């Protein structure tokens, strides 16, 4: 089937009309026989598919929409359906929803064509580019191209694929927010209250492109973290940082539910830019936060990690800022004791969990790092690790502790109090956490005391008060 000749690259495949079908006629949707000669001069796509195949059933409506658009614009193309259904009844039932042509149902013929066109999976859409002297040139499977670019993928060949990828590169690297976030019909972003803001107003700002969805629990959790950082930056650095939500929701209702919890902007749900941005930046999972610098170019693809770890302190989200924060945390971590003694144990106990927790969540006020609010979601995730060893104590004598420190130390060493401590911890709020942080920051000289004893001393006081009432 392949041939090498002047003007033809080795390895290219060509087929003639007789080779293409192996039959004299094609079928129309109504069952009418169409002469094979009717497709001469047209751009042909071979559609290998079957009704029993779910990906095929999902792809067919997309192809149908593109086909109608192209035919309405007088594009000289035709699709030929090659059925891999199990029987003729299934083939006819599937074909009745297709406006294009089909080969007659023939299991032997389809097997031959699958070998001829290297079909290893379905759906498969094989474009055939016409040439003057070699019949039809066989192109690569275009299913992915059609799914990613829609009608813009036409005429579905390698040349068009290269053009589209070049256009994506230009949008990704060009630094033009209007070209990146807008389209012909829209030069604005929207907010939850319906206000339209010109994309040009975002020029010169640091932008977070947030890919998420309401149905995704990690997205809902990260939205809360991102909002905390966003609100803090809005107060401390007004106008410097903005977020654009790109919805991966399944419908408009879910999109509105997502947007209702967000104080920032969004791309409209039904806008084609949503799919384009997901393709341009190769989004593989959600939540994903990309950071664009004031020049409009992406310089950080792991915005979720840096926001979750540092919050607003990470701004402007550069590598140098992340390094600075890590150095501060390292000094904080290294200042903590590695081991403590417990009078009930002969050996020393390691404080790895508490130390690791403190190093990533609690920050002393220093010239280079501003105080931050505790992230309660993280606290709730970590508390079961923090309180696992109910016998742990520090080596300092109890007489040197403050009353708050003694409260928590006593509760910590008595297993019967742990359920109460857990209950209060789960019911704590931001104010409680901030009070704990202020208490910690107010006594830097006590850094040799277990960080947990200090940080949650106010919770212990509440529990002690309940114990006093019961007694």
Swiss-Prot record:
InterPro entries to which the protein is assigned, alphabetical: Nucleoredoxin-like (IPR052259), Thioredoxin-like_fold (IPR012336), Thioredoxin-like_sf (IPR036249), Thioredoxin_domain (IPR013766), TryX_NRX_thioredoxin_dom (IPR045870)
CDD domains: TryX_like_TryX_NRX
Residues forming coiled coils: none
Assigned EC number: 1.8.1.8
Leader sequence residues: none
Record domain Thioredoxin: where: 15-173, 179-334
Catalytic activity: [protein]-dithiol + NAD(+) = [protein]-disulfide + NADH + H(+); [protein]-dithiol + NADP(+) = [protein]-disulfide + NADPH + H(+)
Keyword tags: NAD, Oxidoreductase, Repeat
GO terms of molecular function: thioredoxin-disulfide reductase (NADPH) activity
Gene3D superfamilies recorded: Glutaredoxin
Known function: Probable thiol-disulfide oxidoreductase that may participate in various redox reactions.
Family: Belongs to the nucleoredoxin family.
PANTHER family: NUCLEOREDOXIN 3-RELATED (PTHR13871:SF81), THIOREDOXIN (PTHR13871)
The protein's name in its UniProt record: Probable nucleoredoxin 3
Originating species: Oryza sativa subsp. japonica (Rice)
Source taxonomy: Eukaryota, Viridiplantae, Streptophyta, Embryophyta, Tracheophyta
